């Protein structure tokens, strides 16, 4: 068996096409979604990632609002920009690019974001709403990577209801919120959360129908550990220096796992494009909610 590819690039392209239509519909209502980014410092990886987000915006018609500060910016200067983006009506959603400099209280900055403009879906209030809402409509953004995993599988016709999903990793961006997204009634998976300190990982991998590897530990999931027909999404990223002295980026899953898997999301090209497109979806949905709110307020005023 050789795994079929869960193609994140093609799936993201299809979702972008749908988003273009929604952005056009918003334009007819006199509203244009705007994605803001706040980048502190000159980290090359962060600069590249932010630039990619704004290229994505241009593809679907979302306005780009870019704010940059030097690495030695004070916490108060950063918070000033956060407040500015909170108040800017052109900005319907934004992200603070992480990591922030060590002298900055990252949690304080993230909590200062207006929850209605939280494009990453990671504000404590929005995570709390996700905890409290098991089913039905959720009028707050979902965390981008877990939502991207679900959409990637859905677009390939892979059913998650009733399946045992093993999530490896306990980070706030993927591992911890993944269980909340996957156990919503509309998805209905059964989730086990493991991490690098889990002592029975081999046992859990052997029984998992789906594996989402997001621990940031290079090639920690091997063919010997998984069962035939498993569905694997490789989300982890590790930078490893080889014997030749060159640095390369590796995922959490040994590529040889594809010989046992039914479906596999490669790294890169699998979940990464989905994370970025779900960010766009959150921004568009925020603009739609704001436009609907304005219409409701107008109707009330005219009543």
Curated annotation (Swiss-Prot):
SUPFAM superfamilies assigned to the protein according to its UniProt record, in alphabetical order: Aminoacid dehydrogenase-like, N-terminal domain, NAD(P)-binding Rossmann-fold domains
Swiss-Prot/TrEMBL catalytic activity: (6R)-5,10-methylene-5,6,7,8-tetrahydrofolate + NADP(+) = (6R)-5,10-methenyltetrahydrofolate + NADPH; (6R)-5,10-methenyltetrahydrofolate + H2O = (6R)-10-formyltetrahydrofolate + H(+)
UniProt record, GO biological process: L-histidine biosynthetic process; methionine biosynthetic process; purine nucleotide biosynthetic process; tetrahydrofolate interconversion
GO MF, one annotated term: methylenetetrahydrofolate dehydrogenase (NADP+) activity
Xref: NCBIfam families: PRK14193.1 (NF010789)
Annotated organism of origin: Micrococcus luteus (strain ATCC 4698 / DSM 20030 / JCM 1464 / CCM 169 / CCUG 5858 / IAM 1056 / NBRC 3333 / NCIMB 9278 / NCTC 2665 / VKM Ac-2230)
Gene3D superfamilies, alphabetized: Leucine Dehydrogenase, chain A, domain 1 (3.40.50.10860), NAD(P)-binding Rossmann-like Domain (3.40.50.720)
Protein name: Bifunctional protein FolD
A GO CC annotation given for this chain: cytosol
Main function: Catalyzes the oxidation of 5,10-methylenetetrahydrofolate to 5,10-methenyltetrahydrofolate and then the hydrolysis of 5,10-methenyltetrahydrofolate to 10-formyltetrahydrofolate.
Keywords, ordered alphabetically: Amino-acid biosynthesis, Histidine biosynthesis, Hydrolase, Methionine biosynthesis, Multifunctional enzyme, NADP, One-carbon metabolism, Oxidoreductase, Purine biosynthesis
Pathway involvement of the protein, from the record: One-carbon metabolism; tetrahydrofolate interconversion
Positions of disulphide bridges: none
Assembly and oligomerization: Homodimer.
Stated family: Belongs to the tetrahydrofolate dehydrogenase/cyclohydrolase family.
Stored Pfam families: THF_DHG_CYH, THF_DHG_CYH_C
InterPro entries, sorted: Aminoacid_DH-like_N_sf, NAD(P)-bd_dom_sf, THF_DH/CycHdrlase, THF_DH/CycHdrlase_cat_dom, THF_DH/CycHdrlase_NAD-bd_dom
EC number of the protein: 1.5.1.5, 3.5.4.9
Binding-site list for NADP(+): 169-171, 196, 237
